[in-house]
UniProtKB/Swiss-Prot annotation:
SUPFAM superfamilies: Translational machinery components. Belongs to the universal ribosomal protein uS11 family. Pfam families: Ribosomal_S11. One of its GO terms (molecular function) is rRNA binding. Part of the 30S ribosomal subunit. The keyword Cell cycle does not apply. It comes from Oltmannsiellopsis viridis. Keywords: Chloroplast, Plastid, Ribonucleoprotein, Ribosomal protein, RNA-binding, rRNA-binding. It is found in: Plastid, Chloroplast. Gene3D superfamilies: Ribosomal protein S11 (3.30.420.80). The gene is rps11. This is Small ribosomal subunit protein uS11c. One of its GO terms (biological process) is translation.
Length: 129
């Protein structure tokens, strides 16, 4: 008769005291990814994943709600302090940072790594409304 082998749970909750929040703010959406210092993803959320669709995804309010949701998910791992890396020129930049701090995370560092073209691709044409 075969022996019963007891399987241990492979997934264990990590305890990460500090991490990195990557905020990518585009003109259409805001994506917040929270990682540990090594770069492994702990939690993520976007304005679209928070329930906003269409033009409402690009609002600062949607970015704040997405940041608060990502922060709450990451606090399950014991996260308390974060460094924030911001990329992009969207409207949800500042409100995403405000949402992270209001959720209870202490912000240690702010870095802006928005790329600036040295006359690279042609930008989109100006809107005529």
């Amino acid at each position: 008769m075969a022996k019963q082998v007891r399987k241990a749970s492979k997934k264990t909750k990590l305890k990460v005291p500090s991490g990195v929040a990557h905020v990518q703010a585009t003109f259409n959406n805001t994506i917040i990814t929270i990682t540990n210092p090594a770069g492994d993803v702990l939690a993520w959320c976007s304005a679209g994943a928070s329930g906003f669709k269409g033009a409402r995804k690009s609002t600062p309010f949607a970015a704040k709600i997405a940041a608060e949701t990502a922060a709450r998910k990451s606090m399950d791992y014991g996260l308390r302090q974060i460094s924030v890396i911001i990329k992009g020129a969207g409207s949800g930049r500042e409100s995403a940072i405000r949402g992270l701090s209001e959720a209870g995370l202490e912000i240690k560092l702010l870095r802006d790594i928005t790329s600036i073209p040295h006359n690279g691709c042609r930008p989109p044409k100006k809107r005529r409304v």
